Regions:
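Patatin-like phospholipase
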Residues: 1-50, 58-333
């Protein structure tokens, strides 16, 4: 375990840790939270992350924050798949190695980062959580974000043996305990999974997806418009049949959305359970109930939600950061 920062404090404020949870594209909410902290002058001393939370924390400490955000903002769901690379033969649909080489030149050993940092992953052989606090920062993020079925498991050297590691969300989606082990005296956690609705289109019983057929005449302009309109009846029938076929296929959960929803449900339940065991001083739970974990092109919305969630708990955050009186304690007294 990376030794806690033993450098003398420059003030009487407590050493503040940030536990950034898993959530794939919903990780943009972390960016909104960090933007709020920066605006208020809140200094984070310790970063502990799971999956996308680990990547966000590493990007801050590797000094690639702005280029990382610019790159990530350019991604759509399709772009993300292309960036990572498809590989069906090695234990996952996506091979993430290609994406992680993008910032390889900026990678550093975790021991050389300016502040304590660690990522949490899950040992595929034992099911235990593993704290990655040494070696390549990007390799730690790669292991921490290896979502089962989606991203290939990561082979990682732990001590003197190699282990196959998968997403930390399978064991500890919001690593509050890791932040404290790294030396944090106060911890702010950001949980992206507790308030999620995995498949919102199935949230009412006895309903199926309804896909309205588009207007068959829409976009029929130019010299071929009269001919197209003459065959309007046949075209309407074709459009209607296509819409019905699509609705029928989506009236039941599809393979990958079922896998993603299952992961969301398990991580959400696990995050709630662990929140009672590893208690954060401030727990932020952005309402991402309508957010897909693959909605990379919704970064502005997710970032806004994270920012607004932090704003709603501003006084609590400032208090634990030592920048304002602790209202809860004064009330108790």
């Amino acid at each position: 375990m990376h030794r806690p920062d033993s450098s003398p404090k420059t003030s009487e404020r407590p050493r503040l840790g940030l536990a950034l949870g898993s959530g794939a594209a919903r990780g943009w909410a972390h960016v909104g939270v960090l933007r709020a902290l920066d605006e208020w002058g809140v200094e984070v001393d310790v970063y502990a992350g799971c999956s996308v939370g680990a990547l966000i924390g590493a990007a801050r400490l590797l000094d690639i924050w702005d280029p990382f955000l610019d790159w990530a903002r350019s991604l759509s769901a399709i772009d993300a798949m292309a960036t990572f690379g498809i590989s069906l033969s090695r234990g996952g649909v996506v091979n993430p190695d290609k994406a992680f080489t993008r910032f390889a030149e900026h990678d550093k050993p975790i021991e050389e980062l300016p502040k304590p940092f660690a990522a949490v992953a899950t040992d595929l052989a034992t099911g235990h959580e593993v704290w990655l606090d040494r070696g390549s920062a990007l390799n730690a993020c790669r292991a921490s974000s290896s979502v089962p079925m989606i991203l290939q498991a990561a082979r990682y050297q732990v001590g003197y043996t190699e282990h196959w590691l998968i997403d930390g969300g399978a064991s500890n989606p919001v690593p509050v305990n890791l932040a404290r082990a790294l030396g944090a005296e106060r911890v702010i956690s950001v949980d992206l999974n507790t308030v999620t609705l995995a498949l919102s289109r199935f949230n009412r019983p006895n309903t199926t997806a309804v896909i309205p057929a588009p207007d068959p005449d829409e976009g029929l302009t130019g010299p071929f418009a009269p001919l197209a309109k003459a065959f309007g009846g046949a075209k309407r029938d074709l459009v209607r049949r296509m819409a019905l076929a699509r609705a029928k296929s989506q009236a039941q959960p599809q393979l990958f959305e079922t896998a993603a929803a299952t992961i969301d449900i398990i991580q959400g339940q696990l995050a709630q359970a662990r929140a009672y065991i590893d208690v954060a001083d401030v727990r932020l739970t952005p309402d991402l109930s309508c957010a897909s974990a693959a909605a990379f092109d919704h970064h502005e919305e997710f970032e806004r939600i994270g920012y607004e969630t932090a704003q709603a708990q501003k006084q609590e955050i400032l208090a634990v950061a030592g920048l304002a009186p602790d209202i809860s304690k004064s009330d108790d007294e």
